Amino acid sequence: MSLVSESHAEELVRGAGQLGIPLDDRQQRLLLAYLALLIKWNKAYNLTAVRDPDEMVSRHLLDSLSVVPFVAERGRNWLDVGSGGGMPGVPLAIMFPERAFTLLDSNGKKTRFLTQVKLELKLANLEVVHARVEQFQPSTAFDGITSRAFSSLEDFASWTRHLGNAETRWLAMKGVQPDDELQRLPEDFRLDACHVLKVPGCQGQRHLLILRRTS
């Protein structure tokens, strides 16, 4: 029996349309193939607390796709920190095959899963790194750095400071707007923008906070 049903495909296409993000055949096929791998591996690897496959389209795929317009603005070299099961990094790599995405996680089980995703989906623009973020030392700064349910804004900024520069945008996906966390931002970071995300099928508040370095 297929792990991904026709209703999952319909929900994905419908939800992406509501987000204003039409999917071509390749994008739809790869997103559903990724969903099937996530469902399969989650049983043994505990990649996500969402156990019900019927919830994964909205809570993982559509939630990840909600930041596509902001990634589309600019930046060819992206880092997804604490990528876990690959959200939002894998869906973004599928949507932007001409851009490079590095998925970073310190959990070996999760990076093994992400490596399998890269191989099976043939995502040449995806790199998987098994390391702690503080110890990751790439040769060049990233244009954009994403996180989803990773840490506080203070830690996100502090731990990834060395991975960006004054041109880098830090995109933090959050639930309710974290006003208390914003008060504790490092002095060399500022809030550039805050966007309310409307994710089809997701209850509760969703926000995207875009941070920039001030120096």
Curated annotation (Swiss-Prot):
First-tier enzyme category under EC: transferase
Keyword list, A-Z: Cytoplasm, Methyltransferase, rRNA processing, S-adenosyl-L-methionine, Transferase
Gene3D superfamilies: Vaccinia Virus protein VP39 (3.40.50.150)
Presence of the UniProt keyword Cytoplasm in the record: yes
Main localization category: cytoplasm
Catalyzed reactions: guanosine(527) in 16S rRNA + S-adenosyl-L-methionine = N(7)-methylguanosine(527) in 16S rRNA + S-adenosyl-L-homocysteine
Compartment list: Cytoplasm
GO molecular function: rRNA (guanine-N7-)-methyltransferase activity
InterPro entries attached to this UniProt entry: rRNA_ssu_MeTfrase_G, SAM-dependent_MTases_sf
Binding site for S-adenosyl-L-methionine: 82, 87, 133-134, 148
Disulfide bonds: none
CC terms in the record's Gene Ontology section: cytosol
Catalytic activity, EC: 2.1.1.170
Annotated function: Specifically methylates the N7 position of guanine in position 527 of 16S rRNA.
NCBIfam families in the cross-refs: rsmG_gidB
Cited PANTHER family: S-ADENOSYL-L-METHIONINE-DEPENDENT METHYLTRANSFERASES SUPERFAMILY PROTEIN
Assigned protein family: Belongs to the methyltransferase superfamily. RNA methyltransferase RsmG family.
Name of the protein: Ribosomal RNA small subunit methyltransferase G
Species for this entry: Stutzerimonas stutzeri (strain A1501) (Pseudomonas stutzeri)
Originating gene: rsmG
